[in-house]
A protein has these predicted regions:
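Flavin-dependent oxidoreductase catalytic cores
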Residues: 1-364
């Protein structure tokens, strides 16, 4: 059983031992707890871990490949995964948060007058002016930095690069946030330029490196997500990314709204069904033959086997389910699917724990 899930696959130039990927996840843990979490997930049998939010420059808020301590941190993460026969992908990103704007909210957060739930919309309101008014020279510096960061990622031992198509790439892509009047704004082609240049910078530096693109799709009617591109714009956006050097797509809903839209609980009014974002994969498939990884509400091995066997997606990414049971893949392999701890999509200790500064965990 579950033959397709367990079949090796060439995902955008990288051979994976099976079709299961650990989706990029913010943990909010100490280094040692983070290393242990990575070890458990890798040992559980997934083919690749995507390490989320690897900055393309020096960072004030987290680990960076651009300093010795951060570089060593990523080397250790990679070593732990590789020791467990698990590939590792670096999700390169550039935040679209205006640091100066963020600082004015720090006192309120520290005194708890502003909750994390209240902070998010405040920061989102700062995105449009930040993106729209960013100096042309700064834009070029950032897109070029993706290439520099990719070289460091390869040196550290990462097997694949993923360009984070939400964050700044997504905000430049979005007509909601991008009101520029130069070559980076206006038409779909112009709004895609930032992302295309980021991909091109990586491809120029690393001609043979597999490049995954986290493609953030904005839905209308009803409206969900603010960054990224709307479905009708995929016909322009997807071929441009492929031409620039993307070798696979990781397709999901655009962010910059309520986190429970992009990490939907079981009682979500619109995204409650298994594989809740796979319809966006169907849209992307119309414009590319590259491998597509689906994500969102994937917990049931029977459902996932069918999607993979039918060719709807080529890989399946999970975060909450592998937090609930890191041994998901091994249990399938050993014929013990009935023993899997199923994620119930309650968001209590994963998203809930993160928002309460207690780290990302699970009720199990």
């Amino acid at each position: 059983m579950y033959e397709t899930i367990q079949t090796p696959f060439n995902y955008g130039g990288l051979t994976l031992k099976n079709r299961i990927i650990f989706a990029p996840t913010t943990f909010g843990l100490s280094d040692e707890d983070y290393f242990e979490k990575i070890r458990r997930i890798a040992a559980g049998g997934c083919a690749m871990i995507i390490v989320g939010d690897v900055p393309v420059g020096k960072s004030h808020f987290g680990k960076s490949l651009f300093d010795k301590k951060g570089f060593a941190f990523y080397e250790k993460v990679i070593g732990i995964a590789h020791d467990n026969d698990c590939k590792v992908c670096a999700q390169l990103h550039q935040s679209d948060s205006n640091i100066k704007a963020m600082l004015k909210y720090v006192p309120g957060v520290l005194t708890k007058r502003i909750s994390m739930q209240e902070l998010r919309p405040l920061l989102n309101n700062e995105v449009a002016p930040y993106i729209t008014n960013m100096p042309h020279k700064k834009v070029k510096e950032i897109t070029s930095a993706f290439g520099t960061a990719a070289v460091l990622a390869k040196k550290a031992g990462f097997d694949m690069i993923q360009i984070h198509g939400d964050r700044m790439c997504g905000s430049f892509s979005s007509s909601i946030y991008n009101h520029r009047t130069d070559e980076y704004g206006g038409t779909v082609e112009n709004r895609a330029r930032f992302a295309v240049e980021a991909v091109s910078a990586v491809r120029e530096k690393l001609p043979d490196m597999p490049i995954d693109y986290k493609l953030a799709v904005r839905q209308e009617n009803p409206h969900y997500g603010n960054a990224g591109v709307i479905e009708d714009e995929l016909r322009v956006f997807v071929p441009m990314l492929e031409k620039a050097g993307v070798t696979s797509f990781h397709v999901t809903l655009a962010n910059h709204s309520d986190l429970e839209n992009t990490i939907p609980p079981k009682n979500h009014p619109y995204f409650s069904e298994p594989g809740c974002f796979l319809k966006f994969c169907d849209e992307v498939r119309q414009y590319t033959n590259l491998p597509i990884c689906g994500v969102g509400g994937l917990t049931d091995p029977d459902f996932m086997e069918k999607q993979l066997a039918d060719g709807r997606i080529q890989c399946a990414a999970m975060s909450r389910q592998l937090l609930a049971d890191p041994d998901w893949v091994n249990k399938l392999k050993d014929g013990h699917a009935d023993q899997i701890h199923r994620c119930v999509r309650c968001n209590k200790k994963c998203l809930g724990g993160l928002m309460q500064h207690q780290g990302t965990h699970c009720i199990y």
